[in-house]
């Protein structure tokens, strides 16, 4: 049986990236909460590229 996590950069960014968050009201709420909390990384788009 294969594992449930099959990583894909493109899928990850499209689902959890900054533009995806900004596209919906709920997503903007997430960003607002993370900013209020002082997160250095708001979305997966803010990650340092490992290559």
From Swiss-Prot:
A Pfam family annotated for this UniProt entry: Ribosomal_L34
A single GO molecular function term of this UniProt record: structural constituent of ribosome
BP term (GO), one: translation
Record's keyword terms, sorted: Ribonucleoprotein, Ribosomal protein
Cellular component, GO annotation: ribonucleoprotein complex; ribosome
Family membership noted in the UniProt record: Belongs to the bacterial ribosomal protein bL34 family.
The name this protein goes by in its record: Large ribosomal subunit protein bL34
Annotated gene: rpmH
